[in-house]
Amino acid sequence: MRTHYSSDINEKLQGQKVTVCGWVHRRRDHGGVIFLDIRDRTGLVQLVFNPDNDNFKVADSLRSEFVIKAEGVVNLRPEGQENKNISSGKVEIIGDSIEVINKSKTIPFQLDDFQSTGEDVKLKYRYIDLRRPEMQHKLITRSKAIRYVRNFLDNNGFLDIETPFLTKATPEGARDYLVPSRNFNGKFYALPQSPQLFKQLLMVSGFDRYYQIVKCFRDEDLRADRQPEFTQIDIEASFIDEAFIMSTMERMIAGLFKETIGVEFATPFQVMTFADAIDKYGSDKPDLRIPLEFVNIKEDMQNEEFKVFSGPANDPQSRVIALRIPGGNDKLTRKMIDEYTKFVGIYGAKGLAYIKINSLSQGKEGLQSPIVKNISEETLFKVIEKTSAKEGDLLFFGAGKAKIVNDSMGALRAKIGEDLDLFNKDWAPLWVVDFPMFEKDDNRLYAMHHPFTAPKVSSVEDLVNTNPEELSSRAYDMVINGYEVGGGSIRIHKQDIQAKVFNLLGISDDEAREKFGFMLDALSYGTPIHGGIAFGVDRLIMLLTGTTNIRDVIAFPKTQTASCLMTEAPSTVSLEQLNELGIAVKKEER
């Protein structure tokens, strides 16, 4: 139907007849001449119809979002009327003929006025919202990124192998989406939270290198960077170690960013231990573009009478830290400090102490804060020395249980970095390694990553004789600008170690056999050393396109209640369907 896309129309085609198809983006009548901006996925091109044209009446009748096909001759625009904002801006098409393929009702919102349109309206009419050039750019970038990844992995010997969507429920932390079986009454499939076990079984099968661009499903409470269904770049390889995975993935991600948006990452990426990340930034996914670090002052506060600090300072499960904000005296108002106090309260902090450093030569008198009177001058100036604070700086303090301090002050660090625009570079990729094998909650151990991550032990005897809370794992996460974009590990490849890890997690032998018997059996039939990683496609595309909402990079996303406003899913089904599946719906009591 067409000879060219809009972006193909340029001065090289001057005098040539072309055919274009698309939507009427804008219609203007200037002195009896009709100007039409025609939009397709590549951009805009201007179409001109003069009054003496046989199709002038048709052109005059067009309205926004009509779908048309037009023929005409490419002509240079009059001098001074070029449009530098579009690739076809030096030319226009002098229309010969035009065909209305389809009319359009008045759309629910104007594409140029999307910012004043509610999110619910845009999701209900997603097919309209996706016509916006900004949205099309994001999804085109997604397509290019996935194509690059496929080519890279194909060229490096990885095989694209599909794994099942209807599988066994083996909870991995979040709730499963369950699918009832019609053939086996009362039994259910689960939609996979990841292809974890299947990709390991492919290594047992001898395929050596595997990848898949795959949908995964988690029935969990949603955030701005989460969706119930999401896409992973899933990767596994045999006879490898951490260095192989990390170096290969660095090449892939560095190449992806260069190819897609022209950004060059220095390799190898910085490597940081989990312990260092928590100690310095309160987070296992720190944004290293922000030049603010925690300073531990626990020992300095142990003998102070100020119980807010000395209490946690003498508690092994707590920490006391200072966070220096250079020039914070002038940059942070009292109102902002009050807002930050409320902000850290979201994470469980009981308050936010601070000290403004007005003068270093006046002793305590040069320090401004409600807490100054409660702490000795000697300790105050030790803290100032430790933090390298200068006149005009402001110190924030976190004191309490380690998790609360890490979460609250880590979030505060990121917020201040954004509020004050402290970013010292555009991109900061790194690896976080040496994660704890387990984390403890309610006096029970949980896998920090998942139960198939290999611990840093060489035998089951080492595993038995080591305090589980002191075990490190062979896990690694890739972090870019504060986002965990990928996570993986070397896997357990010996049956006795896997069985013991299940045991440490409180999974009985019978339960392990019921849920993971097929995996335990496979590990007894000659399993190679293997490991892998999974990248969140949606998060990567967020970074590549500069958006902060995952819904912007998915064609048809769900809301924060996991519903689709466009199709009205989830929906009820007929009683006949329920009876066929042997399911009775329990009505919610109100």
Swiss-Prot record:
Annotated residues for binding of L-aspartate = E172, R218, H449, R491
Residues engaged in binding ATP: R218, D219, E220, Q227, E484, G536, V537, D538, R539
Membrane-crossing segments per the record: none
Q: Keywords of this protein's UniProt record, alphabetized? A: Aminoacyl-tRNA synthetase, ATP-binding, Cytoplasm, Ligase, Nucleotide-binding, Protein biosynthesis
Q: Where is this region: Aspartate?
A: 196-199
Question: May I ask which residue range the UniProt record assigns to the signal sequence?
Answer: none
Q: Which reaction does it catalyse?
A: tRNA(Asx) + L-aspartate + ATP = L-aspartyl-tRNA(Asx) + AMP + diphosphate
Is Metal-binding one of the keywords UniProt gives this record?
no
Q: What is its EC number?
A: 6.1.1.23
Major subcellular location class:
cytoplasm
CDD domains (alphabetical): AspRS_core, EcAspRS_like_N
GO cellular component terms?
A: cytoplasm
Q: Which EC class heads this enzyme's classification?
A: ligase
Q: Where is this site: Important for tRNA non-discrimination?
A: H30, G80
Similarity remark: Belongs to the class-II aminoacyl-tRNA synthetase family. Type 1 subfamily.
According to the record's subunit comment, the protein's assembly and interactions are: Homodimer.
Name of the featured protein: Aspartate--tRNA(Asp/Asn) ligase
What gene is this protein translated from? aspS
